[in-house]
A protein has these predicted regions:
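Canonical Radical SAM [4Fe-4S] cluster-binding loop centered on the CxxxCxxC motif
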Residues: 1-18
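Conserved, mostly hydrophobic/aromatic
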Residues: 20, 37, 74, 102, ...
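Conserved SAM/AdoMet-binding glycine-rich loop
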Residues: 29-153
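Radical SAM enzyme [4Fe-4S]-AdoMet core and its adjacent flexible, acidic
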Residues: 46-64, 68, 115, 178-208
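C-terminal, non-catalytic macromolecule-binding modules
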Residues: 134, 153-154, 158-202
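Terminal RNA-binding accessory module
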Residues: 178, 185-267
């Protein structure tokens, strides 16, 4: 019992909806308390299937078809593809956890355009604000790249500012690395020392923002899904949390009160 992360997509070929639901039902029956839907491009799910079901259709089918499932998350999603139905599920469905990971990549519009992203900086900020307004306990994560080709100091600063502007609680920071044969590899490159420095600066801003957010959770009541070690797990907003008491059975969901911080997690 515990948390399972399984990919329901393979090589950008979507697994049929009925098969995903059957997988979810079987895993739930085996004792898994939480499932995570993840894939190469999660929000484009269903485009290559008969009837072109949307990700929101898949989530609804899982929740209806696996009534014993207690918690569901989705992996990284594209801001441009969060439609009204998916937004409603993320913000109103009790079994959907209050945590979403957005594929943002950068906070500068020119860099986003050169990355061929489908959203602008304003789109990202607006979506983050909508999510937080509709579900104030939502924790937003994001992928951010430091040192993409042609990024200057001003563009890097706009990406750092995005951490606060988009209420980012969990940031995955990636220093840019050129891949031969890609359009980006043919653009003017940022030097390796500058890339490393910008990645470090992003991590510092993200770390400070996360610590401030974690501190705000002290004294709050949360639900913890106990994982395999019996003494830790994740609460609904995905904050890593350790029990300060005796071990509990893996897979059990416990009501807890947050007592303090434990490094980059809670206790």
């Amino acid at each position: 019992m515990g948390l399972l992360m399984r990919s329901f997509r393979r090589s950008k070929v979507a697994v049929p909806l009925a098969q995903v639901v059957e997988n979810a039902r079987a895993l739930t029956a085996s004792g898994f308390g939480e499932l995570v839907l993840t894939g190469v491009d999660t929000t484009s799910y269903g485009a290559d299937l008969p009837g072109a079901p949307r990700l929101s259709d898949l989530i609804t089918a899982i929740l209806d078809g696996a009534p014993m499932l207690r918690r569901l998350r989705i992996g990284s999603i594209d801001v441009a593809e969060i439609d009204d139905a998916l937004f409603a599920l993320l913000t109103q469905e009790d079994r959907m956890m209050g945590h979403v990971h957005l594929s943002l990549q950068a906070g500068d519009d020119l860099i986003l355009k050169r990355m061929k992203r489908r959203h602008s900086r304003a789109d990202a900020v607006a979506m983050a604000d909508r999510l937080m307004t509709a579900r104030p306990d939502m924790a937003i994560g994001a992928d951010l790249i430091a040192g993409f080709p042609t990024e200057d100091d001003a563009a890097a600063a706009r990406t750092r500012a995005l951490i606060g502007d988009c209420h980012i609680r969990f940031a995955h920071i990636f220093p840019y690395s050129a891949r031969s044969g890609t359009p980006a590899a043919r653009m003017p490159q940022v030097s390796t020392p500058v890339i490393k420095a910008r990645a470090a600066a992003l991590r510092a801003v993200a770390g400070a923002a996360q610590q401030k957010w974690l501190q705000s959770l002290v004294g709050s009541h949360q639900s913890l899904l106990v994982e395999r070690d019996g003494i830790s797990g994740h609460v609904g907003n995905f904050a890593r949390t350790r029990l300060d008491d005796d071990a509990a059975p893996a897979g059990e969901i416990l009501p807890i009160t947050i007592l303090g911080l434990d490094g980059d997690g809670l206790i």
